[in-house]
Amino acid sequence: MRKFLEILGLLILLVSAVFLAKELNAQTVPQAAAPESKVTTPKVDIAALVAKEFGDKFKVATDIAPIFGDFDHDGTQDVAVVATGDNPLMGEGLHNYKTLDPYNASFGYGNPKVTMAFSTSEGVSRYILMLHSWQAPGRKFVLVNVPFEKLRLGHMMYKKKPIDALESVDSTGVQGAIYFDGKKYRWEIIGSELDAK
């Protein structure tokens, strides 16, 4: 009987080792690459587009390329452009865009008429110009007070659906997501670049 129990114990140990090896192998095998985004970068004169849709007071920044994606989730391509310029509140009526402060709104108060007076950016203010359906321009937004050094296309889940969003990284490494909720743009913290290291 003792011999039988030893063999049974070894058999259980062997089966457990096989299952453990399979589990570890499944964790270390790299997953298939995510499908490439269907968004392509079209050839367009961004400076002329910005001047036409937002006014000639905005100058396109050269350090961050325009970002194309479906930010308003309607199936058409939108564009996000980093620009510098004068106070965007002055051109809202003439160029029919909406100025938003999604960063300060995430902390409770995002009225750009007030929060722009307390801007902590040093030097020239940088804005994110959002143009929905840029080929046949739709809604337009100027996002102010969003801290960023890097800006890139990202993806996130919103109301159980995958959506395009902007991923921002500020000078301290804090990462934020800028996304459209159907009415306005929102900013929320998503982590830190230091977390990934």
Go through each PLM region and give its residues.
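Beta-propeller-forming repeat regions
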Residues: Q27-H73, Q77-K197
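Sec-dependent N-terminal signal peptides
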Residues: R2-A26
